[in-house]
């Protein structure tokens, strides 16, 4: 069964293929074909995930999955939240350059914040939408703290700054398998894989 991921982000596609395969789900996850970007107008991760999954299912006629994920920083009252990928305001350059700009701004905003007040959570809402109108949403969260400088070369986004509770290495220093086992996206998509199996076999 083919399922479309409502994203053209290759890093995310690779990550979700690993997670779904490890869940024992036999699906071919394909990237969203080229076309107009869908405006993420929701105010919550769940709303944005559903917006993207609905658009992908409409565009392709296939069951679609999408996620909206981000970083919620305690000291910033939950921001950057749904604006995590656009936090710095930079829209040009490569994804790596935009990630670096986001990280630099976040570090500047937390410059004088002591370690005990640098708590944060990675949050993910994962959505499944079928052409028949079935809609499901699952959630995952990973708590941790933000460091004062980036560490590690793996991962993407805010991974180099994020030290998950119980870990001695940042998300960007973990192997792919280690990160998948604890990540917010891994938690949400493992639950979604169960729903996907039920929907596709019903």
Swiss-Prot record:
Cofactors (names): Mg(2+)
Record-listed Mg(2+) binding positions: 68
Residue numbers annotated as active site: 68 (proton acceptor)
CDD domains in the cross-refs: HAM1 (cd00515)
Any one Pfam family match given in the protein's UniProt record, by short name: Ham1p_like
Reactions performed catalytically: XTP + H2O = XMP + diphosphate + H(+); dITP + H2O = dIMP + diphosphate + H(+); ITP + H2O = IMP + diphosphate + H(+)
InterPro entries (UniProt xref): dITP/XTP_pyrophosphatase, ITPase-like_fam, RdgB/HAM1
Main EC class the enzyme belongs to: hydrolase
GO cellular component: cytosol
Residues the record lists as binding substrate: 7-12, 69, 156-159, 179, 184-185
GO MF, one annotated term: ribonucleoside triphosphate phosphatase activity
Note describing how the cofactor binds: Binds 1 Mg(2+) ion per subunit.
Gene3D superfamilies, per the entry: 3.90.950.10
Single GO biological process annotation from the record: nucleotide metabolic process
E.C. number: 3.6.1.66
Entry keyword set: Hydrolase, Magnesium, Metal-binding, Nucleotide metabolism, Nucleotide-binding
NCBIfam families membership: RdgB/HAM1 family non-canonical purine NTP pyrophosphatase
Function as written in the Swiss-Prot or TrEMBL entry: Pyrophosphatase that catalyzes the hydrolysis of nucleoside triphosphates to their monophosphate derivatives, with a high preference for the non-canonical purine nucleotides XTP (xanthosine triphosphate), dITP (deoxyinosine triphosphate) and ITP. Seems to function as a house-cleaning enzyme that removes non-canonical purine nucleotides from the nucleotide pool, thus preventing their incorporation into DNA/RNA and avoiding chromosomal lesions.
Protein family membership: Belongs to the HAM1 NTPase family.
Subunit field text: Homodimer.
Name listed for the protein in its UniProt record: dITP/XTP pyrophosphatase
Protein source organism: Frankia alni (strain DSM 45986 / CECT 9034 / ACN14a)
Species lineage: Bacteria, Bacillati, Actinomycetota, Actinomycetes, Frankiales
């Amino acid at each position: 069964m083919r399922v479309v991921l409502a994203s053209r982000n290759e890093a995310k596609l690779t990550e979700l293929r690993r997670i779904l395969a490890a869940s024992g789900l036999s699906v071919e996850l394909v990237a969203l074909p080229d076309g107009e970007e869908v405006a993420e107008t929701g105010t919550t991760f769940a709303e944005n995930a559903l917006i993207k999954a609905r658009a992908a299912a409409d565009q392709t006629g296939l069951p679609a999955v999408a996620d909206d994920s981000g970083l919620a920083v305690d000291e910033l009252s939950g921001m950057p939240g749904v604006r995590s990928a656009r936090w710095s305001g930079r829209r040009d350059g490569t994804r790596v350059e935009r990630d670096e700009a986001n990280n630099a701004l976040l570090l500047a905003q937390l410059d004088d914040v002591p370690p005990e007040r640098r708590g944060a959570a990675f949050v993910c809402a994962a959505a499944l939408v079928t052409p028949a109108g079935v809609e499901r949403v699952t959630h995952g969260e990973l708590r941790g703290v933000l460091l004062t400088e980036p560490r590690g070369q793996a991962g993407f986004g805010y991974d180099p700054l994020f030290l998950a509770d119980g870990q001695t290495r940042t998300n960007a220093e973990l192997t792919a398998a280690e990160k998948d086992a604890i990540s917010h996206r891994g938690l949400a998509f493992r639950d979604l894989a169960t729903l996907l199996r039920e929907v596709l076999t019903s």
